Design a protein with these regions (language model features):
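Membrane-interface, cytosolic juxtamembrane amphipathic helix immediately N-terminal to a transmembrane helix
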Residues: 109-148
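Glycine- and small-hydrophobic-enriched helix-loop-helix hairpins
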Residues: 41-113
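A generic short alpha-helical patch detector that favors 3-5-residue windows
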Residues: 21, 94-98, 121
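Generic detector of short, locally flexible boundary/turn motifs and exposed helical patches
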Residues: 9-11, 27, 87-88, 116, ...
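Juxtamembrane/interface alpha-helical elements of multi-pass membrane proteins
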Residues: 2-71
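Amphipathic alpha-helices that form helix-helix packing interfaces
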Residues: 26-29, 33, 66, 85, ...
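Low-complexity, flexible helical/coil segments
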Residues: 36-39, 100, 140-141
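Hydrophobic H-region at the start of alpha-helical membrane spans
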Residues: 1-2, 148
Length: 148
């Protein structure tokens, strides 16, 4: 019984830590996207495809599907493709619902803007993630100590 409780505690602590790490990984992914747009002067659909090979494996299917959908369904808006694909590929992957919502909502505004506004939209999304990560850090540390 004691070992089960200890095992459960370590499992919960690892899950808490993973939630925080996912926020940092999403932030890293957005920095890559911003860099492709800013310094590579890459159009958004191509930039999404390029960063899909540079991000963590759990986000690669999402990015690759967005890029493929943009290529094959040019009549659909970027926002619609981004949000539908997020529902299909990210909802079950991202543990923290707020990270998922922030990333999903970015698709509403980024697709139809010029390069400068795309960069600012990505930066705003990164700031929202930073705020959420900051709020989570103390809670994760406390919870991890309690679970262990």
């Amino acid at each position: 019984m004691i070992f089960a409780g200890i095992g459960f505690g370590f499992h919960k602590a690892a899950k808490e830590q993973k939630r925080l790490e996912q926020g940092i990984a999403i932030k890293r992914m957005l920095y890559l996207l911003q860099g492709e747009i800013r310094y590579g002067f890459t159009p958004l659909p191509e930039a999404v495809l390029k960063i899909s090979t540079k991000t963590e494996k759990e986000y690669q299917p999402f990015l690759k599907k967005v890029a493929k959908q943009l290529e094959t369904h040019s009549e659909e808006s970027f926002a619609k493709i981004w949000q539908q694909t997020a529902d299909q590929k990210l909802k079950q992957v991202i543990y923290e619902p707020k990270f998922y919502e922030i990333l999903k909502n970015m698709g509403e505004t980024i697709g139809y803007l010029d390069q400068q506004m795309q960069e600012k939209t990505i930066l705003l999304t990164i700031e929202q993630l930073d705020d959420q990560i900051f709020l989570m850090k103390d809670q994760v540390v406390k919870n991890c100590k309690m679970y262990r």
